[in-house]
Amino acid sequence: MKLKNYNLKSKIALVLALACFTSSAFGEESGLFLGLGFGAHGAKQNIRSTKLLDENGLKIRAMQSATDFGGAYYFGYKHIFDEHSGLRVYLNSESNNVEVEKSNGESAIRSYNIFGLGVDYLFNINPNFGLFVGINSAAISWDKEIWSLDWENDEQEYRGYVAAQMGLRGIFGEKKRHAVELFGKIPFTKTTFKYQMAGVTVVEMDLKQTYNVGLRYIYTFAMD
């Protein structure tokens, strides 16, 4: 009789435990969030002469690639629809280092910056693990010493930037306010600079971020 009573109590305790787990299993909440990211990126420079120089025997073709590290900040709002899906919209500010060779032969670290708007769809496989996919539309600005022939006088330029992004999310904490993400970005756009003589373009330079991968930490603020 005592054994049966013990089994009954065990079953009740198990049911209560499962109920508590279920109520908090998908506890990720909507709210404002801040994020910090760090990762590696690739950049490519492609220089080519135009038809005018090519036809006069002055053909120029040069391509260089570089890899380095950078950091990013994020601020936005996340809305959770149900236990498996959500959407977030945020502002991002990124700075990526590039090593350049100056005219005197010395190397220096310069950067290009990205300021924009990101939109991600969130899909949770379970309470602690999920995926995301989205797009980042932004403005990109390359340091003048990366592209300018007269960097002391040329003005800083901002151009369009669009990239697809995707990754994995680990969600943790009592109220699921913390997340660590492994992300990857695939840029679609490039920045083209044109160099002219007597009003005629003679050389063009393309600069492009080729990829960006890394880790993010995201903290969501309570809305209650």
What do these predicted ranges mean?
Residues 47-49, 94, 98, 157-224:
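Predominantly the C-terminal beta-signal and adjacent terminal strand-loop region
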Residues 34-38, 87-91, 117, 131-135, ...:
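Membrane-embedded beta-strand positions of outer-membrane beta-barrel proteins
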Residues 28-34, 79, 83-87, 127-131, ...:
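Outer-envelope beta-barrel architecture signal
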Residues 26-78, 212, 218-222:
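Short glycine/proline- and aromatic-enriched beta-strand/turn motifs that initiate or cap beta-hairpins
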Residues 45-56, 99-108, 143-154, 192-201:
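Outer-membrane beta-barrel translocator domains and adjoining extracellular loop/strand segments
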Residues 42, 65-146:
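Gram-negative (and chloroplast) outer-membrane scaffold detector with strong preference
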Residues 1-29, 223-224:
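Cleavable N-terminal export/targeting peptides
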Residues 30, 63-71, 107-115, 156-164, ...:
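Residues that define the transmembrane beta-barrel architecture of outer-membrane proteins
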